[in-house]
Amino acid sequence: MQRRVLLQSSMGLLMLSPWGFVRSGETLPSDAEVISSFGWATDVHHCRKSPDFWDEEGVAHHEYFDLSLEKFRKAVAFMNKRRPDFAIELGDFKDCTKTGSRAETVGLLDEVEAAFRQFPGPRFHVAGNHDFDKISLEDFLAHTENSDEMKGLTHYAFTKGGIKYIV
């Protein structure tokens, strides 16, 4: 046990020292050298849940779903400044309360999709497990919009900058 504490402490001190950070010598490519770029968001979990709640097993959770939409709006604003080739969200776009209705859940999806639509370039979605809480796949597809010919699809591929992206 004492050996473990010593090793953990030593690693922490090493990370804080000037020798603890590895420098690869790599630099970011210039804008002219970038082949393709994209904005990426995942697990937004937009919902109006109390920050402190208990699940069916009585386990307490401290999650701040009510802050997710504003954080996502900031992420989209950052993407707008960087101007990537496209933006993609990788699932769990919304969440829902245990007692939530289909209409309430679709409303949450509409709100977070409206924030995503502030990105002026091509936008794509990957459906996550929470995206189907209280709604169907058809509901999800009807209230989100992939760009180009990927509208209404859950599996697709597209090419940007000579790179093929497969979803």
Predicted regions and their residues:
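Residue-level detector of conserved, well-ordered beta-strand and adjacent loop positions
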Residues: 7, 42, 159
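Alpha-helix C-cap/termination motif
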Residues: 9, 13, 81-82, 118-119
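Short gly/ser/thr-rich secondary-structure transition/capping motifs
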Residues: 21-22, 70, 147-150
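N-terminal active-site segment of His-dependent metallophosphoesterases
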Residues: 25-102
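Extended active-site neighborhood of metal-dependent phosphoesterases/phosphodiesterases
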Residues: 28-30, 57-62, 98-167
